[in-house]
Amino acid sequence: MKKTFLFLMLLPTMAFAQSGTNSPYSQYGLGLLSDQSTGFNRAMGGVAQGMHESNQINHQNPASYSNVDSLTFLFDVGAALQITNFKEGNRKLNANNSNFEYVTMSFRVAPRFGMSAGIIPISNIGYDYYTTNKVSEGSTTSYTTQYNGSGGTRVMYIGAGWQPIKNFSIGANIGYLWGSYNRNVVNSYTDENANTIGRYYSAEINSYKFDVGAQYTFKLNSKNNITLGATYSLGHDLGGSATLQEISNSLNTSDTITVTHDKAISIPHSYSVGLAWYHTKKIRLGADYTLQQWSTCKFPDLTSKGYEVTKSAYQDRHKVAFGGEFVNNVNSRRYLDRVHVRAGASYTTPYLKINGQDGPKEISATIGLGLPISNSWNNRSMLNISAQWAQNNAKGMIRENTFRINIGITFNERWFQKWKVE
């Protein structure tokens, strides 16, 4: 029987989760793909390709590390709080979620050469719901299908950026990618003579991730310049294995079938291009485009032929983002003059196919502030805070509206400064 995507009720256990998501859409593929931007560019819709800040970390384009300020050590940590409204027909439900998201650091090693390291989320899985249906029209026997899952993937990276010639920078990240997921589907019947069937999907992922990037800055005049940026992420098979365990229980018997596939999951080749316009130190505007070739990736799935590795669950993913910021005067004595005001938006097509239909598209809008942290020993650190609205929607499926508060703190320390003793 074709699996119904409709839910009757999300369980109370979803009310406050730590997995980074509580979306039923995360039961497919690698789950919901994470927003990998950090605090400052997340408030600008996630634009990153042309951004090269001396006091913020932009790991999405490693070429930007070459612009890290000398004598500076940057440390950035972020978290998010969100509430999601799920709507299907006349049924509505709110669910809360919080998540520690990323930690990164960056510093200059030599003139025109910087490095960065950190841990960044790639995908998240977290859901728990059930459906109830009649076995057939007019039947008194009904069955309940319970769906629940958890997991996700992360990458721990180290990268370097170098400016070999004036205005041109290159960089690379290499990282250890790891994660796991557990997805369970259990059918139970009101007729005690009917079999209870449980399917338990699991996977362990251990692999690598590799990205390269470049940036070139055109000096238009003394007040304006434009930076073009581009990155490429290598697509490849992931190490580890995926397993399906099917257990059928009746009053008198229990049968178990286990199927395992090695290297059954892959990640896509990804290409990003973008530009950023800088006007003095007051205005930054940027726009990015990203293509992820998920249609070439494989994933284990239960089909009419059994549990097999297929490429039918995915399609190419496209994302467009734009945003910017304004700061009146970064050197002013007045605090409000040094506050960064940011805004941005993005549109993303789905990488998933659900029962042969396109998964949910996402539209998102964000506003935020960069608040300087000033005290007697440090006036360079910054609190990056933003409010984000996002909608995931697909025809005939659940609509999700999410309101998210993103919080990031960038600590900016002058670790390598030589102090004079009088």
Feature map (PLM): residue ranges:
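Subset of outer-membrane beta-barrel
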Residues: 18-422
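Bacterial Sec-dependent N-terminal signal peptides
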Residues: 1-22, 422
